[in-house]
Amino acid sequence: MNGATIGSSEALVAALAGRRRYFASLGATATDHGVLEPYTAELAPEEAERLFQKARNGEATADDQRRYEAHMLMEMARLSTEDGLVMQLHPGSLRDHNSAVWQRFGPDKGADIPVATEFTRNLRPLLNKYGTDPRFSMVLFTLDESTYSRELAPLAGHYPALRLGPPWWFHDSIEGMRRYREQVSETAGIYNTAGFNDDTRAFCSIPARHDLARRMDANWIGGLVARHIIEMDEAREIAQAVTVDLVRETYRFPAMEA
């Protein structure tokens, strides 16, 4: 797409950097990475090149692929520190689970199933290198709700670069949103979340989804007021944050005109 010849791992990263610059020039502020697992590892340049050439020659094993993908996530994080694009990570979907559907109709026909996902160990190399870098910002999503309070909330509460994305896909629902707030907020707080964003291709559903998210957040905030955990002025401030301010801050959108 950019006319470059990609014959090496270094050339691949350079080509991706070029595409990132192109999208940024059109107003993009974030990248999005879909992986089966959020495994990260920093490889020596010669090892990354060896795995790249094995893949080009059709000789790469499943472990080779796993290690190279882990290295590329590290490279994408590095590029984010250079170009300022927010790094989004959507792990944990086993794509095309139904082999018969895949063979007849091809990929991405609705047979994508969540799998258990481990973040704490898998992201440690990336977060040790970039988690406290003020140039870096990462938004984490999950399909494994068991990780909300055990892993994601503590990670976001510790690393300044992390924000937790809203409930995603199967959990983008009334009960999914309720579970998210209950499991995340006590440890991660409110201001370590990304507010409610929307990456759906179902364009006409966007207003309804935002309406549902705002109603669910209002219900949750109202519950905090009813239990005398916060006051009304604090509730109004939180409502503004979760609906508008956190998203604009997370994705580095220009400030709104007064």
What is each stretch, according to the model?
Residues 190-191, 208-258:
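Mid-to-C-terminal alpha-helical segments outside catalytic/metal-binding sites
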Residues 41-43, 97-106, 148-156, 174-181, ...:
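Histidine/acidic-residue-rich catalytic or RNA/ligand-binding cores of hydrolases
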Residues 20-27, 127-131, 154-159, 184-189:
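Acidic (Asp/Glu)-rich catalytic clusters
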Residues 144-146, 164-182, 231-254:
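C-terminal helical cap
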